[in-house]
């Protein structure tokens, strides 16, 4: 008999999208699923929509709870899940029709704790464009979870997304893995914890997810105070590299911790300069305070080249910013980022 797959869908203020999202699971070629919809105290019509969906198919379970955020909703879903595997899906995204079937087959045949897609589709709501994007290349992938974490999640700052990944429920529950509460970039923390304890992972060489890019979504927002999260991510990487067998993985560790910190810092500084929530001078002052952080300065000084970034134009721009920051040309770096956004929307 086909193993049961639990699909956890947190719902909050997505009344326009949730039905389409759930239907993308109901119409999967793989039928042995339980769909756990977690209404995270949504103040719109989502609770009623969820209840109506439950009436339409006996595979759907609806849990109503007080608002606690995305991590809280996902954790509620984990606690309720009965499947051999668990699959997370955001309530404004949809799945490729054979994704669950294909990924379960891979997990079963290769005895893997997770199956990770190498790519996904970005669907832009404003102009209805669909663009294929890659999490990582075939060359980057390793079935050793720790090597994958070091090379991709940490080394390139990629593939941190937990949605549309097939996870072993046994691995999650035996190691008491949960999404951290009250954090931005919760997927990164969860995946690093998972990869630290997983025995083997496999790759799905197709896009499994249609990821909706919409105005006002959580992932599209500029977050004040995100630098605190960047430093927490850096500490998490330090914890990860300390726990694993340094002798076995020494060649993979290198300066990847520094690289991720610098990449996250530069990207955040760029988002600050793009934002118009504060006056230009205040944005520059904030960026300078970040560049002068002792941990950032240490990481920059240890790196001889800019961190990885996808795309030629953005790679060139990151190299330019990195060179300025390395030479303590902070104000020029801020001005360059500001002008680039104004002229080209980098």
Describe these PLM feature segments.
Residues 13-27:
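Short, well-formed alpha-helical segments that are part of the catalytic scaffolds
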Residues 39-49, 66:
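A conserved acidic beta->alpha catalytic loop
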Residues 3-6, 24, 34, 189:
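Cell-envelope/extracellular polymer assembly enzymes that use nucleotide-activated donors
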Residues 274-346:
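Membrane-interface aromatic/basic loop that binds lipid-linked glycans or pyrophosphate carriers
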Residues 86:
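Short aromatic/hydrophobic "clamp" motif used to bind/position activated sugar donors
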Residues 70, 91-204, 211-227:
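Donor-binding/catalytic cores of nucleotide-activated saccharide
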Residues 65-81, 91:
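Glycine-rich, basic loop-to-helix element that forms the pyrophosphate-binding segment
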Residues 25, 40-41, 68, 91:
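Conserved short acidic donor-positioning loop in nucleotide-sugar-dependent glycosyltransferases
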């Amino acid at each position: 008999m086909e193993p049961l797959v639990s699909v956890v869908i947190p719902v909050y203020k997505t009344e326009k999208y949730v039905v389409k999202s759930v239907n993308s699971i109901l119409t999967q070629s793989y039928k042995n699923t339980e769909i756990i919809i977690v209404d995270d105290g949504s103040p719109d019509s989502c609770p009623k929509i969820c209840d109506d969906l439950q009436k339409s198919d006996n595979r759907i379970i609806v849990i109503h709870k007080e608002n606690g955020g995305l991590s809280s909703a996902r954790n509620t879903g984990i606690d309720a899940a009965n499947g051999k595997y668990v699959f997370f899906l955001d309530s404004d995204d949809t799945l490729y029709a054979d994704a669950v079937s294909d990924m379960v087959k891979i997990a079963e045949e290769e005895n893997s704790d997770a199956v990770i897609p190498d790519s996904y589709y970005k669907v832009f709501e404003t102009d209805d464009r669909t663009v294929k994007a890659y999490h990582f290349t075939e060359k980057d992938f390793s079935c050793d979870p720790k090597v994958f974490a070091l090379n991709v999640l940490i080394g390139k700052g990629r593939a941190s997304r937990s949605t549309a990944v097939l996870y072993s429920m046994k691995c999650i529950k035996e190691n008491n893995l949960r999404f951290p509460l009250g954090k931005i970039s919760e997927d990164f923390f969860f995946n690093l914890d998972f990869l630290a304890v997983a025995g083997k992972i496999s790759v799905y060489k197709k896009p499994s997810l249609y990821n909706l890019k919409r105005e006002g979504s959580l992932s599209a927002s500029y977050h004040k105070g995100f630098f605190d999260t960047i430093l927490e991510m850096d500490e998490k990487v330090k914890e990860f590299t300390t726990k694993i067998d340094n002798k076995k993985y020494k060649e993979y560790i290198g300066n990847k911790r520094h690289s991720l910190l610098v990449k996250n810092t530069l990207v955040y500084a760029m988002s600050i300069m793009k934002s118009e929530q504060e006056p230009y001078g205040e944005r520059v002052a904030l960026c300078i305070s970040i560049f002068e952080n002792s941990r950032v300065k240490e990481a920059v000084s240890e790196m001889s080249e800019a961190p990885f970034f996808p795309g030629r134009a953005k790679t060139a721009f990151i190299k330019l910013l990195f060179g300025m920051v390395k030479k303590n040309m902070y104000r020029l770096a801020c001005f360059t980022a500001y002008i680039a956004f104004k002229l080209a929307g980098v």
